[in-house]
Each structure stands twice: as structure tokens, then as C-alpha cells.
């Protein structure tokens, strides 16, 4: 009780002073319906459900995957998003020596959602600043609605258990003091549905089959064979005969040894009936049945049946797991943290977001093809690709530029016009040979005319 008393030592939130008791609209705590008895006769509580390997594997997969995702804070203004410093209460929710870190807080938050449908976190304030978060036991928080100025508001009734096992009221608190992250809610409700409660028949059947199998095989609950002898035997005679048979036919050294039966004894092997063997198929069927409850791919909890229905490649299966299994829970947690961020800063442009890049990474060949296309089309810079592959940037800013094909130029710059083609070379005309000048004076005889002949005569 010391932890709760220190956490809620003030008894109630001052914001609730002056509100009349009749204004409370209590919500029936039986919505949690934890510890109900299934038709199989098994009592199903979160602790009992975790004894089923499929339940444990499903909640472990979701809680540990979400808890290890990077969580960043951003500021979005003017259509652009810029990463800013993450508040300490998100990076170090409980920084005291021996306190829990972010992974522990997130893991417990997701476990509360998966097992009980609701997560409650105590918010520790120091003046106007949040200084830490603590995950609360959902079974010790009752949610109510109160009418304030005609509006319905959530308030939380916190309980603890004293040394005598009695329930002790610690006080009433507002959403400023207790962050409530609900799971899937029915229309008109304001608390989440418990998956364990609504699936108690499936989980109860798995528990019953598991218990039946344990009892079936415990200490040879059904004998593998029977030796019949005529007449009657005393208890001492039966014990001697049983011990003699065990000594002669049990153990590795006596394997496949021929057994000799005397005095009319008969050996009969006892086979498992179909009804008795049915629990094996029942247990096998419960694995995908429980995986379906939590929305996880069965192949991720070691049931490879129909694994290709979630995608044919690693990248496709990871994307499907991210979209259909993780994203709904991540959105709820992000919304809760965003409410706290606004309560602390009054800045509605700030928000937190999980980074899913790591889980959506494909095989090396697929990643290299993606980076190659991104680099060629100016989507990524070389340094961004290197950072995604956990490599250091290129020196001297060589990897900061975005590049596109040469016919487009660099991103952010006007492409240089292509140079005009050079005019074709003009060949000089071929030189004609010079004509010989005609000699002056008397022409040749061959070229003489008749008139010239007459003159000569």
C-alpha cells in the first residue's frame, strides 16, 4: 500500500472539489468480467490465461514489439513536420534508481490493454511539468462519469488493499492525474472490452485440454498394456509379479526383449481411443483460435499452417503484421500520450509517433532495390540511405544532395538548357583548274576560217 499511498497521498484531485456525489454516474465494474467460469469449468483470469502457451506467445509478441519501437516527438506547422526533443517523461518515465524505463512502461501498458482491455497510468507532476509515469493495476481503478457544466467527464476511483486484505478507497482523480488508454469499446461505453473476458470460452477450452493432457500422462494415468492372469492373487503376489515384469521388460537395456508368460497369463496392449486422442486436435486448433483473438499471425507464434496467407515474402508479412496487428494499438497509445503532451505544453501542433521503419524492413535485396529507386528519383539522399542502414554520413556533406536523372537536374535547381547543336560544317567548293589563255596574234591553222584563207590568198 506504500506505493499507492505515496502516489495518491493527496486523497483526491482538487479539480473535483464541490461536485456533488449524486452527479457521479458509476460504470459497472463487471464489464471487466475477470475471473468468470467458462463452460469447460475452468476459471479464466489474466494469470490463468497466460498459462496457455498461445496466449502467452501472443501477448509477448505484441507487448515486446511495441515496447521496443522507437518513439519520437514532432512539431507540425505550415504543412511541414520537424522532429523535436522528446520529453523526458517519455524517454525516462521513471528515472529514479531502480525505476522502470520506457520499454518496461510500454510493455506493461500493452499487457494491460491485451489482458484487461484498459491501461491506466499515474501522471506525476512537478509544477507545470510532467516528471514521470507509473502503470497502475486496472483492477484497482473504477471509471465513472461526472456531469460538469452539462458535459460528461471521466473520473477515476482508486482503490488499494491493506494488510488485512480489505479494499481501501484512496480517492477520486481526473484525467490530468490518471491517463486512461482504452482498448476496443462498445458503442456508448467509455471503457475497453477485455479480450480475456470475451474470449473466455476459447481460452477456457485450451486450459481444459491442457489440464486433461497433463492428467492423462501423469504417472501413467492410462496403462500402456495389461497382463491378465487366471484366478485371484493376493496384494503381495500382485506386487511381486508387477515388480518382476518391470525388472524384466523395462529400461533401454531390455528394449525389444521377448517376454515369457506362464500359468495362463495373457498380455493385452491398450490403445488410445479416438475420443481420448481428440484433445490433441483440440489443442492444435486452439493455437490459431487464440491468435485470431489477439490479431497476430499464427506463424509468428510457431504455427506455420497457412502462413502464406499473410504474404509470400518477409517484407509483405511484416507489413501485414504492422497494419493489422500493431497499428490499432499504436494509434491508441499515441493518442493517450498526445493528450498528456497537450496538457503539459498547450501546443496542439506537437505529437508523438512510433517509428515503424525497422519492422517494415525487407530482405537486403529488397532494401537495396528500394534505395536505388529512391536515390535515382530524388526521394532519398545518400546520407538518408546510409542512416537507414545504420551507417555514418559521407564526409564534407557529400551525401546531403538529392539527385535525379541528368535530363532533369538536381532537386531544387532549374535544369540547365541543353546546348544548341553545332551547325554542320560547310565544305569549301572544289577548285576548278585554271584555263590556259589564248595566244595573241595569228590563230592556229585548225582554227582558221574561210575568210582568213581568202585574205591570205
UniProtKB/Swiss-Prot annotation:
GO terms for cellular component: viral capsid. GO terms for molecular function: DNA binding; peptidase activity. Keywords: Capsid protein, DNA-binding, Hydrolase, Protease, Viral capsid assembly, Viral genome ejection through host cell envelope, Viral genome packaging, Viral long flexible tail ejection system, Viral penetration into host cytoplasm, Viral release from host cell, Virion, Virus entry into host cell. It holds the Pfam family Phage_portal. Residues 391-457 are annotated as: Disordered. Homododecamer. This is Probable portal protein. It comes from Streptomyces phage phiC31.
